[in-house]
Swiss-Prot record:
Pathway linked to the protein: Cell wall biogenesis; peptidoglycan biosynthesis
Localization terms from the record: Cytoplasm
Family assignment from sequence similarity: Belongs to the MurCDEF family.
Gene source species: Neisseria meningitidis serogroup B (strain ATCC BAA-335 / MC58)
Protein name, per record: UDP-N-acetylmuramate--L-alanine ligase
Cited function: Cell wall formation.
Keyword presence, Nucleotide-binding: yes
Gene Ontology terms: cellular component: cytoplasm
GO biological process: cell division; cell wall organization; peptidoglycan biosynthetic process; regulation of cell shape
Length: 469
């Protein structure tokens, strides 16, 4: 096993949300963990507080003494630490391969899907915790109740996100898997072929042993398309009563969702029960159904499921409520932060905001993520952005890409303006966004700060400015 052969593990890009969680769990398992990153952030500070050596920047000396070097997809092969490791014949592996090794220590539950992975993983961990199963978890966002995105539990299960963006989820060998949905995103990875995208998810499901079980959402058209090709045991979930687990009587109760769960899953007691989910949105009802399916499969009680969903405190940057901020002209606005950056998940989050806060004017501050995504989904972005009451667009977060003509925020603003409903406000520099928002907001508004790039710094800056008023 790895523990008998490996002592020192070095992470290149340790501050990334996927990397930091794995590093923390390995540290808690007793490995000597170190890492490096170009930028300090909350994750690197947290790891440092645990006693993990985190180096600023990347130099060859950082890998000296390492038994293995772990890299994120953002790390280039020209990185000096990667080059030095290869020269010293130190194995260099992707983070997904190290996550796969972690799953050798526990029974793995892997959550895949284009949207909803982080929330579903968090809900699953919450319910398993409420059931006394004390799971290990590695999540792509901070679980608010735990104050971290990873935790080493004493129980037999590890719950983790499975990343399809680079097909690295095919390294994992879980005993249970979830597919929340399949959408056409990260299509460069799949040669812009829907067939290859479908096959990757089929292969992911087939990574389970014969005694495993998958939970598949039949509300997703692409998931329904792969069902005939899935040969491993699976159960379906969704809002349709043909699913093995489905929901009815769905109600918005403020920022919560109340619904009835119906179970007609083979090998389980048939019946129904009511739950209250402590977060808004019909899309989160689906995420909760996936977590409920996994929980029932591992033997959690209905009471534990109800407790885990009602007590769920959310996850960082997934409809994360910061509370009211003061406005210069008097009054307050409710600040909510969200990671959404694909039109489908944005539409779901905006609908959740509308349902939870019916009387409020909805103001969206959005930073598109990647020029290629903006180009490929331009019309979809235009449609979803046009559904809010006021819109502030900041420039595309490139994520290492070169700009593409007519695939930037100015082009989006022009296209939305032509539709005649909104007059988008363009903010070229994200650093100027907090002050601009304070001048746009009105008393009683909800402002949704959304995107997967540097816009994540806006809430803290906006709160700081607001306190000076």
């Amino acid at each position: 096993m790895m523990k008998n052969r490996v002592t020192n593990i070095h992470f290149v890009g340790i501050g990334g949300v996927g990397m930091s969680g794995i590093a923390e769990v390995l540290h808690n398992l007793g490995f000597k963990v170190s890492g490096s990153d170009q930028a300090r952030n909350a994750a690197t500070e947290h790891l440092g507080s645990l006693g993990i050596q985190v180096y600023p920047g990347h130099t060859a000396e950082h890998v000296n003494g390492a038994d293995v070097v772990v890299t994120s997809t953002a790390v280039k092969k020209e990185n000096p630490e990667v080059v030095a490791a290869l020269e010293q014949q130190i194995p260099v592996i992707p983070r997904a391969l190290m996550l796969a090794e972690l799953m050798r220590f526990r029974d793995g539950i892997a959550i895949a899907g284009t949207h909803g992975k982080t929330t579903t993983t968090s809900l699953t961990a919450s319910i398993l915790g409420a059931a006394g199963l004390d799971p290990t978890f590695v999540i792509g966002g901070k679980l608010n109740a735990a104050g971290t995105n990873a935790r080493l539990g004493k129980g037999e299960y590890i719950v983790a996100e499975a990343d399809e963006s680079d097909a690295s989820f095919l390294h994992l060998t879980p005993i249970m898997s979830v597919v929340t949905n399949i959408d056409e995103d990260h299509m460069d990875t799949y040669g812009h072929s829907v067939e290859k995208l479908h096959q990757a998810f089929i292969d992911f499901i087939h990574r389970m042993p014969f005694y495993g079980k998958a939970f598949l959402c039949i509300d997703s058209e692409h998931v329904r398309a792969i069902l005939p090709k899935v040969s491993k045991p699976y159960a379906t979930y969704g809002l349709d009563d043909t699913a093995d687990i489905y929901a009815t009587d769905i109600e918005n109760v403020g920022a919560q969702m109340k619904f009835t769960v119906h179970v007609q899953m083979k090998g389980h007691e048939q019946g129904s029960f009511e739950v209250v989910l402590n977060m808004p949105g019909r899309h989160n009802v689906l995420n909760a159904l996936a977590a409920i399916g996994v929980a029932l499969e591992v033997g959690a009680s209905v009471e534990a499921i109800q407790k885990g969903l009602l007590g769920f405190e959310g996850v960082g940057r997934r409809f994360q409520k910061y509370g009211d901020i003061k406005l210069p002209n008097g009054g307050t606005a409710l600040l909510v932060d969200d990671y959404g950056h694909h039109p489908v998940e944005m539409a779901a989050t905006l609908a959740a905001a509308r349902g939870a806060y019916l009387e409020k004017r909805l103001v969206l501050a959005f930073q598109p993520h990647r020029y290629t995504r903006t180009r490929d989904l331009f019309e979809d972005f235009t449609k979803v952005l046009n559904t809010v009451d006021a819109l502030v667009l900041t420039e595309v977060y490139a994520a290492g890409e070169e700009p593409i003509a007519a695939a930037d925020s100015r082009a989006l603003a022009r296209a939305i303006r032509v539709l005649g409903k909104l007059e988008p406000i363009y903010c070229e520099n994200v650093a100027d966004l907090p002050e601009m928002l304070l001048n746009v907001l009105q008393d009683g508004d909800i402002v949704l700060n959304m995107g997967a790039g540097s816009i994540n710094r806006v809430p803290a800056a906006l709160l700081a400015l607001s306190k000076q008023i």
